[in-house]
């Protein structure tokens, strides 16, 4: 099982990191921090300048997931980022990824939660320093999902202008 968890952590963690690097540094054709700020403003966030580096760094924390280091923290940040992405961009476009729906984001949301619930595996930093037994399990998975939903709801409700105002 540890080999499967290692593979899953590394692949999904690097996918998250790549998206964060696009937003933060403009790598791989990404918008960079200025473009991320502009995008956040276009979709109705009130403080896009403050949120842009937070959004980019939250996705770049996929490196923590890939390494299996501070796994619940990485899962919380990544899951919250995906809930915000679903709520602010993808939900209204339907389920299927082909139409920019939330299908892909839902998968990305579920993997860090599942890894927290099962533990990062034998080949992880958390295991190497003896934290994995204390920072994983079903209760941790539920706690991370709950906190991610609450945090994302705060961002979507408090930090985002009403939709009518954003499109006016």
Model-derived segments and their meaning:
Residues 44, 68-70:
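Helix-loop interface residues and adjacent transmembrane-helix termini in multi-pass membrane transporters
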Residues 34, 38, 55, 68, ...:
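Internal, well-ordered alpha-helical scaffold/interface segments
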Residues 26-51:
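Membrane-interface interhelical connector segments
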Residues 21-33, 57-61:
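Hydrophobic, membrane-facing alpha-helical anchors
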Residues 1-27, 49, 71-168:
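Extended, low-polarity transmembrane helix blocks
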Residues 57-66, 89:
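Hydrophobic, membrane-inserted alpha-helices
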Residues 50-58:
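Short hydrophobic alpha-helical membrane-embedded segments
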């Amino acid at each position: 099982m540890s080999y499967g968890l290692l593979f899953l952590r590394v692949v999904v963690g690097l996918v998250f990191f790549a998206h964060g690097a696009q937003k933060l540094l403009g790598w791989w054709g990404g918008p960079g921090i200025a473009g991320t700020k502009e995008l956040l403003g276009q979709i109705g966030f009130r403080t896009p300048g403050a949120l842009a580096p937070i959004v980019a760094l939250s996705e770049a924390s996929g490196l923590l997931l890939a390494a299996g280091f501070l796994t619940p923290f990485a899962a919380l940040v990544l899951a919250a980022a995906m809930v915000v992405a679903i709520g602010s961009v993808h939900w209204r476009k339907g389920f299927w990824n082909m139409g920019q729906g939330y299908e892909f984001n839902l998968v990305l949301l579920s993997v860090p939660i599942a890894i927290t619930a099962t533990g990062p595996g034998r080949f992880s930093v958390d295991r190497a320093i003896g934290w994995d037994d204390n920072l994983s399990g079903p209760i941790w998975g539920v706690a991370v999902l709950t906190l991610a939903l609450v945090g994302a709801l705060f961002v979507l409700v408090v930090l985002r202008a009403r939709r009518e105002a954003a499109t006016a």
